[in-house]
């Protein structure tokens, strides 16, 4: 059993944060909320998503798992006004999700969860450096880097966090000292990442006051931030691009 009501803009932002990784997901539902762990087809990026029951205006659920096509949900929410309420109810026997929004009623066919890639195992990484910054600053640096290159270097040197992109003739670099950051735990960190992935991953951070980056040397980066006014969280784990000598 699953029956819930939630603000349309909040749900739209949550779905968008997941959709940058995969098109189809397994929603694990229980009385405490909804969670997803998913990895992209190339095994480069992983998303870990949690949306607590407190994010909803109404929430009543037993433990269950449903398969969802995120593109269909995105299209459906595209016609909703930001202040609309989205009401959802699961029809378990028919494998349908009933959705009411903006006076319109939808019957969404669900996917068989067994046909969707199983939850990945989340690796336990010791990442020595941690940077906390405003989401808009991260988005700005990535946007600038896109114009120069297809990858970006991110690292920590002494008390400075830097993001750098180099093209054939041009380069761009943003440095942020401890006093410009919300928090900094210095450590050896310098890794190269694909902007094809970073560009999509940082899109949801534009509305976020605090984004935490955990880094190492030639290690994956963990990008972590709250959603739904603190009632949810999403973490992205992005593998580095290793340059051969």
UniProtKB/Swiss-Prot annotation:
Q: Which HAMAP family match?
A: DNApol_clamp_arch
GO terms (molecular function) for this protein are: DNA binding; DNA polymerase processivity factor activity
Q: Does the keyword DNA-binding apply?
A: yes
Q: Which domain of life is it from?
A: Archaea
Record's protein name: DNA polymerase sliding clamp
The alphabetical list of record keywords is: DNA replication, DNA-binding
Looking up SUPFAM superfamilies in the UniProt record yields: DNA clamp
The record's similarity note reads: Belongs to the PCNA family.
User: Gene3D superfamilies, alphabetically?
Assistant: 3.70.10.10
| A Gene Ontology BP annotation from the UniProt entry | regulation of DNA replication
InterPro entries found in the cross-reference section = DNA_clamp_sf, Pr_cel_nuc_antig, Pr_cel_nuc_antig_C, Pr_cel_nuc_antig_CS, Pr_cel_nuc_antig_N
Q: Name one Pfam family in it.
A: PCNA_N
- Report the function annotation for this chain: Sliding clamp subunit that acts as a moving platform for DNA processing. Responsible for tethering the catalytic subunit of DNA polymerase and other proteins to DNA during high-speed replication.
Summarize subunit and interaction data from the UniProt record for this chain: Homotrimer. The subunits circularize to form a toroid; DNA passes through its center. Replication factor C (RFC) is required to load the toroid on the DNA.
Task: Report the gene name.
Answer: pcn
